[in-house]
């Protein structure tokens, strides 16, 4: 397995940029769409050998019926999150059942998908993550995130951050083109 983490600090960022560009070209030659390649290479490019597997799994998952809905739900989640947001969820501040449900499902999926990502079963991880979409939809239908109560607002944003983090081991879904 090739990992940039194993290289000495003498390796220039230009070398990493060259390798990333080369990997981009290789994945494109394999027929993987540019937006999916960009999404995969935006996440943990240090693990070069895994980037191809993640891109292929993402391309296969794109052909699934619930891909577009999942990509739209992810965008909805990340669009509301402030840059660099890093608060932690406080379950004692939950007001609605939708908050509890989304937090619980995110925790369950995190445990399941971390195992699948470590096993490099990216397609199965994506299928499992897709299970959260109806709960995300329910959350947005029932919960006002940007409320005046700052603590409540931050807690709700923290729940959404947990959802966004589910994707972080595979791809940056915000880079994926989705038909309207």
Give residue spans per PLM region:
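Amphipathic alpha-helical "coupling" segments that flank catalytic cores
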Residues: 9-180
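Positively charged, low-complexity/disordered segments
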Residues: 1-11
